[in-house]
Amino acid sequence: MLFIYMMSTGQLNSYIEHTALKPDLTIAEVQQLCNEAMQFHFAGVCVPVYFLNAAIEILNGTGVDIVTVIGFPYGYSSTISKFEEAEEALFRGADHLDVVINIAAVKNNDWETVENEIETLTKLVHAENKVIKLIAETGMMSDIELDLICKIANDSKVDYLKSSTGVNGPGANVETIAGIREMLSPDILIKASGGIRTRSLALELIEAGANRIGASKSVAMVTES
């Protein structure tokens, strides 16, 4: 617990990807999101592909990572569809692509599809020297499924495993983050996301192994007394 009290607000801010992914998102809200990211020195912003141009116009050259989502939020679109979506995101200038695992394929034990898709998308993203995060939707996965997902992530050499979309099932929790940290290779990082609304939870997740925090309540989190 000492770690929680030692981390400064500035240090916490450097972990946060300020996120807006709701379906009725407006351009004004994206602009506010980006301005807040600059004001509070957040690590990145996460927005839908549709809003990438708007985010890049504001944040280009600031050092704030531009993050978007692929196959969001259910992950069951085809690999070809995800590939084309990822290509567009890269063309528009995204730095990080957060890709939802094919949850339906996992639940039907179609691990060949899961593995082939992750490998294909990882090669595409890495060919452009960008970052891929695999959204594992941990709250919907059994221990066995999560173990297999971590093995595929290790073999495919994704950059991050991300805990949740924030849409399906429970969000991030300390126990799960600590567990996947043990299963992942040391060079694969973790993004905790989903239901993170307080500074204390964010710090506990970082202590458990999270390298980034995805949150929509970021400003309230870092300004709470």
Model feature map: region roles:
Residues 1-6:
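Short, Lys/Arg-enriched N-terminal segments with co-localized hydrophobic residues
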Residues 9-40, 52-57, 64, 69, ...:
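Alpha/beta enzyme core
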Residues 43-51:
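N-terminal low-complexity or amphipathic/hydrophobic leaders
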Residues 74-81, 222-225:
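Short, charged, surface-exposed secondary-structure boundary motifs
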Residues 191-195:
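Short glycine/threonine-rich catalytic loop with a Thr-x-Gly-x-Asp
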